[in-house]
Amino acid sequence: MADFWGGYLWPAIIIVLQCLAIILPMLGAIAYLTYAERKVIGAMQMRKGPNVVGPFGLLQPLADGVKLFLKETIIPTGANRAVFIIAPLMTFILALIAWAVIPFDAGWVVADINVGVLYLFAVSGLGVYGIIMAGWASNSKYAFLGGLRSAAQMVSYEVAMGLIIIAVILSAGSMNLSDIVEAQRQGVWYFIPHFPMFVMFLVSILAETNRAPFDLPEAEAELVSGYNVEYSAMPFALFFLGEYGNMILMSGITAILFLGGWLPPVDIAPFNWIPGIIWFFLKIALILFVFLWVRATFPRYRYDQLMRLGWKVFLPGSLIWVVLTAGFLVTFDMLPR
């Protein structure tokens, strides 16, 4: 019995607690990201935003959650019931499981694997399936077209994102996310030497998360909300939880790859007195603000413009940068040992 507790059950309980320690705060962060978005965009449009439910509207996300929870789930006639229900669950779960390899501070990671970057890339690549399944299972031409757009868009920008990440891996000499952060401790944050790729990566994560100005899969004027047009109640909410969860995830990945993860801006007092996890969350908040700022500022791209940018600008640009990075590191004997 002691062997069972020590060898199997206790480690399993610890893993479950670690997962809950990430998932529960993440759900709260997603809820209040929707509140922050409405407040920030309201301020940019010179209005108040939500201000009725609770002081300063702080209970608005809870009210929205209760409203969606109490609504009826309607499945359209002719829809594939099983796939229709699985699609939003898949989108939401994939947004959560990627956090297993994200280090919040030195040693603060659930699974510190040596191929953390590959794991993230694999999980983000699977995200498109939930949207395609939703579009196909809804038995609606608008939803189906939105799903196809999403697939083309995400695949197009994932290629460029992969090449940008290769440039960072070459500089750090590791695919372990903690090692990439520690490599930036020795020199400079990678957004300085790789600044063009940093800008490209920011634009690519906007496309990857289907956010404005690349929200073509849910273009209201053309597709009546796109792939989620037939969804209501909690399945509808799960799509938005997945979208906002992916926003936070991509912000965390950007902070790790280019902004030094949990490292302070300068390694001197009083900056290094602040815990690393605080710096990490501040960087995520900064990138999330960029998401909201872009949404309030830029009009939606046309579909052909979106594809042209991905295939004719980002793909060759990131490929050339990888070749230049590799050539520079080899020429000056700066490859990580």
Swiss-Prot record:
PROSITE patterns: COMPLEX1_ND1_1, COMPLEX1_ND1_2. Keywords: Cell inner membrane, Cell membrane, Membrane, NAD, Quinone, Translocase, Transmembrane, Transmembrane helix, Ubiquinone. Its main location: membrane. Its EC number is 7.1.1.-. This is NADH-quinone oxidoreductase subunit H. One of its GO terms (biological process) is aerobic respiration. Belongs to the complex I subunit 1 family. It comes from Rhodospirillum rubrum (strain ATCC 11170 / ATH 1.1.1 / DSM 467 / LMG 4362 / NCIMB 8255 / S1). GO terms for cellular component: plasma membrane. Pfam families: NADHdh.
